Amino acid sequence: MKLRWTCIVFLALFITFLPFCPLPLYAQTQKEVQYIKAYLGGHEVQVTYREGGPIYGTFFFLDVHFCASGRYLLFGQSRKQTVLGNEQVNNWNDSGSWDVVTFQGHAALQYVATSGARDIIPMEVLPDGRVHPLTGASMQQIGRAQCK
């Protein structure tokens, strides 16, 4: 009897507060997807992050040109301090296709490199309108994309 009463109370509370729940989460995510596509499309973005420890970790600096056509051009550089006090610098470039999709309830940047590498990076829109990856990297819009 007590279990039945508990279930009835729970059901009544659920029905009572259902209108106050943010039900259209899918619609909100779709708005973010469209916003992030517009934010990235046609712009050059600088991404910086570090892998490894604070002393001998590797710092990455990426300049990514997100073309409105769905293509991207990436110019990357990594920098790492060696045990001997030298700095090891590597430069590379990449290209491929990009899109913003819904992934596990988040807006996410999906890319496929011409080399075949692919990834999905969850993104968020900050209160000031900037877009930020949820991976801990720093991202800043720095100009118009140079697309051919």
What is each model feature region?
Residues 3, 12-13, 26:
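Low-complexity intrinsically disordered segments
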Residues 1-5, 98:
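Positively charged n-region of N-terminal signal peptides that target proteins for export
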Residues 25-148:
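Lipid interaction determinants
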